[in-house]
Regions:
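Short, charged juxtamembrane terminal tails flanking transmembrane helices
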Residues: 1, 116-119
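Membrane-embedded catalytic cores of phosphoryl/pyrophosphoryl-handling enzymes
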Residues: 60-63, 67-85
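Structural signal for the C-terminal ends of transmembrane alpha-helices
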Residues: 56-62, 111-116
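Juxtamembrane membrane-interface segments at transmembrane alpha-helix termini
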Residues: 26-28, 45-47, 81-88, 111-113
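Alpha-helical transmembrane segments that form the membrane-embedded catalytic/substrate-binding core
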Residues: 46, 50, 92-112
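Interfacial helix-loop-helix junctions of multi-pass membrane proteins
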Residues: 31-33, 39, 81-103
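"…centered on the first transmembrane helix and the immediately adjacent amphipathic helix/loop
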Residues: 1-57, 70
């Protein structure tokens, strides 16, 4: 394994752990920002977080046109995070959050697809 491949794996796994950690905390920074600004930022952050997860996962995926791995990963992580919200104080299960997670991940896959196509 070359250093480039190793770094991609480290970035992907670190980011995935960070996402799981942040989404399973009782109070999030996003919620604090929403309260301070009066804006609904939750869905945008779900989309952007999983867009990055999709990009990192697809770049880490050695099979260039294989998308089931990344989509499955997004579904599993999204479901895991949303179902843990049943038991975490001050968190709510929202199906729309899961939808934005998946849309973000698929958008990340599309970005990597076009990036690789140009190279």
């Amino acid at each position: 394994m070359n250093i480039h491949s190793y770094l991609k794996k480290i970035i992907f796994y670190t980011y995935t752990a960070f996402v799981i950690f942040m989404y399973t905390r009782p109070v999030t920074i996003v919620r604090q920002l929403e309260l301070a600004s009066g804006l609904d930022l939750d869905k945008m952050f779900h989309f952007l977080t999983f867009l990055l997860l999709g990009v990192f996962a697809q770049l880490n995926n050695n099979i260039k046109n294989e998308y089931t791995y990344v989509i499955s990963l997004a579904l599993i992580i999204s479901c895991l995070i949303e179902f843990t919200h049943f038991v975490i104080p001050y968190r709510n299960f929202e199906i729309l959050d899961g939808v934005f997670n998946i849309i973000g991940c698929i958008t990340g896959i599309i970005i990597v697809y076009y990036y690789r196509k140009k190279i």
